[in-house]
């Protein structure tokens, strides 16, 4: 299978104060989120001038992917589209059609399976092609890459740097975005949480740490709905009660600095740590690192050349899915599960 373009598909984020509320309304459309909750979340964005870091990082990643494709001998145009804010994926796919693109590889900024990590991006692809209509390019979503060796190495280096900056014996804590327990059980089952735990295991092994914690962050929704726990701040409180005063937090659930990273960890978690005399260091995310861009090229090459998936080896490997064409569901154990 040959491609004549690449599409970087992401979540999106506002790039000015006037964009914050419309962006949040797009994100929460149809979910019945009360206006006062949107106002509360909007304040997180206003804290940073109404600008999410994600679009800037993704534009830099587009440039890196383009350079890595050229270095690999596969020069292709790289397009950028989002689910929730400009550039919207529908507009990007229309641009691709107008430029004569016939088949594009789609690399998403989510390494995971499950609904939020995989199926929503599949739905984005189907919606964009339907909006464009006749002449829309074939869009091939690349596989999940939570256990790609390059991703493991990037997180391992970030963890090592964070741990070495702390004094004394530090606790290693991995975080990822929480989701409702029912959603996690519906896919796999528990595909997403197992993938997160497996990546944590791989990164810990690569850094020589056998003892670590996996916790969750950024939950939302009604308090009576159970989500993956413990929350990072609650876990910091538990560590404090055990007398632990140095913590390295590694947000392995995120490939770049989403607002959830810079607000929930760099502000809320750090504020709690400072108030309770805990030294906290947050590990870096891959962002626009050239090795992360090469990971995307690896996934493309697997499809073009028919290579087997490049996956890190570890104890009790967890399945990965995600490959699909034109918004087709990827697997009965991931995307193929019917949503309620």
Curated annotation (Swiss-Prot):
Catalysis: reaction(s): Fe-coproporphyrin III + 2 H(+) = coproporphyrin III + Fe(2+)
EC number of the protein: 4.99.1.9
Protein residues bound to Fe-coproporphyrin III: 52, 121
Main location: cytoplasm
Cross-referenced CDD domains: Ferrochelatase_C (cd00419), Ferrochelatase_N (cd03411)
GO biological process: heme biosynthetic process
Pathway: Porphyrin-containing compound metabolism; protoheme biosynthesis
Family annotation (Pfam families): Ferrochelatase (PF00762)
Top-level lineage group: Bacteria
InterPro entries in the cross-refs: Ferrochelatase (IPR001015), Ferrochelatase_AS (IPR019772), Ferrochelatase_C (IPR033644), Ferrochelatase_N (IPR033659)
Keywords for this protein: Cytoplasm, Heme biosynthesis, Iron, Lyase, Metal-binding, Porphyrin biosynthesis
Localization of this protein: Cytoplasm
Stored PROSITE patterns: FERROCHELATASE
Key word Iron present: yes
GO MF entries: ferrochelatase activity; metal ion binding
Binding site for Fe(2+): 177, 260
Broad class of enzyme this protein falls into: lyase
A Gene Ontology cellular-component term: cytoplasm
Function field: Involved in coproporphyrin-dependent heme b biosynthesis. Catalyzes the insertion of ferrous iron into coproporphyrin III to form Fe-coproporphyrin III.
Family note: Belongs to the ferrochelatase family.
Protein name: Coproporphyrin III ferrochelatase
Lineage: Bacteria, Bacillati, Actinomycetota, Actinomycetes, Mycobacteriales
Gene: cpfC
